[in-house]
Amino acid sequence: MARLTQSFRLLPRPWDPSAPGAREMGEPDLFTCACCGLITPGRRFPWHGDGPGPVCALCNILQDPTRPAIEREAVLIWWPKLPQTRIMTLTRCAHQALMQTLGNGPNGQDVVWHRAMDAIASGSDTAMMPAQCKSALAVLRALHARTTEARRRLETTFPRLLATALLMANRADPQINESATTLMDGIRLFPLGRLYNGPTDIYPALVREWLDADPQPVMT
C-alpha cells in the first residue's frame, strides 16, 4: 500500500466523474486506495500525491479543497503528529463501522446517519445511538475536537479559506514561505461524513457500497 502523504497539501483537482481514470459507482472491480489503504469498489480517482495508484472518493477531497460543497464535507483540524493518510483511514473505518451498526437500508438509515454526523460536528449528545456505535463515535469526536486548535491558529476551520490564502500568498518571500510550510506541517483535513454530487449527498450510499465489498467489521 502506497500511503506516504504525511500532511494535507494543496493538490487541486476538480471532482469530475468524466475525468480520465474516474470510474462510475457500482463498477464491480476492487482496488486499494493509495491514500487510506482500504479496499474499495467502483469509483476511483487518479492520485496526485505521493505513491502510485487511484484513490477512493473520500480521499479525493484532499485534492480539491475548493470544491463547491467543501465546507459541508470537511473541516480543518490541527494534529501535527498524525499523518493525513492515517486520519483518512481512521475516519473511513469509523464511518464504515457506524454504518454497519445502523444497518444496511438506504431510507431511514440516512436520516440517522446525518443526525449522527450533525451531533459529532456540534458536540451534541449521542446517547440515543446504539451502544455498538461508541467506538466509532469516540474516534470521530476525538478527531473533530482538534478543530479548536485549528481555529485558534488560523481563525477559521474552512478549507476553502485556507486554500485561497495559500494560493494568494507570496511564497517567494522566505518568511511567508517558512510560515506557510510550518502551518501545512500541522494542518489536516477531517471529513464530516458527507460528500455532495450537486445537491445530493452520496456519501451514505458510498459507505454502504464499501461495506458490501468488505462486510467484515472494521473497528471494534
Task: Show the residue positions of the predicted features.
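Alpha-helical interaction/linker modules in multidomain eukaryotic proteins
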Residues: 3-14, 99, 108-125
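Charge-rich, solvent-exposed alpha-helical interaction surfaces
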Residues: 90-93, 97, 112-119, 139-142, ...
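Exposed alpha-helical structural elements
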Residues: 6, 86-89, 93, 135-138
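General structural signal for secondary-structure boundaries
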Residues: 15-18, 41, 80-86, 129
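N-terminal cysteine/histidine-rich coordination modules
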Residues: 1-76
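Polybasic, low-complexity binding patches
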Residues: 61-102
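C-terminal, charged low-complexity interaction regions
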Residues: 123-220
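Charged, low-complexity interaction regions
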Residues: 102-107, 151-152
